[in-house]
């Protein structure tokens, strides 16, 4: 097996496959949409990032189908390198060639700008609907909901200029997520995503209008928790809006 892979269930390539199956069952990465990447924070080189490829059924993904990059953005390994000219999955046509996820530059932005340990991109219907209900807004806000406490309280360190977690958000806090407009090609979202990350240091996610959401965290498990918590809050927000209940309590 390549030095980039391991049989350990906690290895990033194996975790991506596990999470893709889970997210598929949640309806977040259907039809080959969405993507996951994990930085090998506990490995010998914490700058190594594993990224799920483009155009693959996420629930059928295999570890060796991952692309491997090194921050700030060099591709070290392609699944085409080990395929002998044929795909690694019997699901794919023999002429299939693996392509890096179109999310790759956006994932790398989260790692380079926020020192993230994992970045998740889903096509959650709750995320899409929330951006449609508030189509005239450039940010999504919500307060006084218990689930907000699952999200990190982030601040800019005055000495380093880096965004750091200083605790967890509290019940009375207001969650604010930036909303950026979608583009015809995923990679064209990169500049808007980077601007949102810069302008919203307290956010751990960016909504993409009529598209989905990008969520990151300091570890893969934190990113998973943040993604689940935000999706819960977005689903609740849709119901509150339909019932005429303000999302931010005065």
Swiss-Prot record:
GO terms for molecular function: methylthioribulose 1-phosphate dehydratase activity; zinc ion binding. It is found in: Cytoplasm. Binds 1 zinc ion per subunit. The active site is at 146 (proton donor/acceptor). Substrate binds at residue 103. HAMAP family: Salvage_MtnB_euk. It catalyses: 5-(methylsulfanyl)-D-ribulose 1-phosphate = 5-methylsulfanyl-2,3-dioxopentyl phosphate + H2O. GO terms for cellular component: cytoplasm. PANTHER family: METHYLTHIORIBULOSE-1-PHOSPHATE DEHYDRATASE. One of its GO terms (biological process) is L-methionine salvage from methylthioadenosine. Keywords: Amino-acid biosynthesis, Cytoplasm, Lyase, Metal-binding, Methionine biosynthesis, Zinc. Pfam families: Aldolase_II. It comes from the Eukaryota. This is Methylthioribulose-1-phosphate dehydratase. Pathway: Amino-acid biosynthesis; L-methionine biosynthesis via salvage pathway; L-methionine from S-methyl-5-thio-alpha-D-ribose 1-phosphate: step 2/6. Catalyzes the dehydration of methylthioribulose-1-phosphate (MTRu-1-P) into 2,3-diketo-5-methylthiopentyl-1-phosphate (DK-MTP-1-P). The lineage of its organism: Eukaryota, Fungi, Dikarya, Ascomycota, Saccharomycotina. The keyword Electron transport does not apply. Belongs to the aldolase class II family. MtnB subfamily. It is an enzyme of class 4 (lyase). Its EC number is 4.2.1.109. The keyword Metal-binding applies. Its cofactor is Zn(2+). Zn(2+) binds at residues 121, 123, 211.
């Amino acid at each position: 097996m390549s030095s980039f892979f391991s049989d350990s269930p906690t290895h990033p390539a194996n975790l991506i496959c596990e999470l893709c199956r889970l997210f598929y069952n949640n309806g977040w990465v259907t039809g080959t949409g969405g993507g996951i990447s994990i930085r090998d924070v506990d490995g010998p080189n914490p700058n190594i990032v594993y990224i799920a490829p483009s155009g693959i059924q996420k629930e059928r993904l295999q570890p060796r189908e991952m692309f491997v990059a090194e921050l700030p953005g060099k591709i070290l390994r392609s699944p085409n390198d080990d395929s002998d000219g044929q795909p690694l999955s019997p699901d794919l046509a023999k002429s299939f060639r693996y392509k890096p996820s179109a999310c790759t530059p956006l994932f790398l932005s989260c790692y380079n700008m926020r020192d993230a340990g994992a970045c998740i991109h889903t096509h959650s219907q709750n995320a899409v609907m929330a951006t449609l209900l508030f189509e005239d807004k450039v940010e999504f806000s919500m307060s006084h909901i218990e689930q907000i406490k699952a999200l990190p309280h982030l601040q800019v360190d005055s000495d380093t200029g880096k965004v750091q977690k200083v605790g967890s958000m509290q019940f009375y806090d207001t969650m604010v997520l930036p909303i950026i407009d979608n583009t015809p090609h995923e990679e064209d979202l990169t500049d808007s995503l980077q601007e949102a990350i810069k302008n919203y240091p307290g956010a751990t996610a960016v909504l993409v209008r009529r598209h989905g959401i990008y969520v990151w965290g300091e570890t893969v498990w934190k990113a998973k928790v943040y993604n689940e918590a935000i999706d819960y809050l977005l689903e609740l927000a849709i119901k509150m809006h339909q019932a005429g209940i303000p999302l931010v309590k005065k």
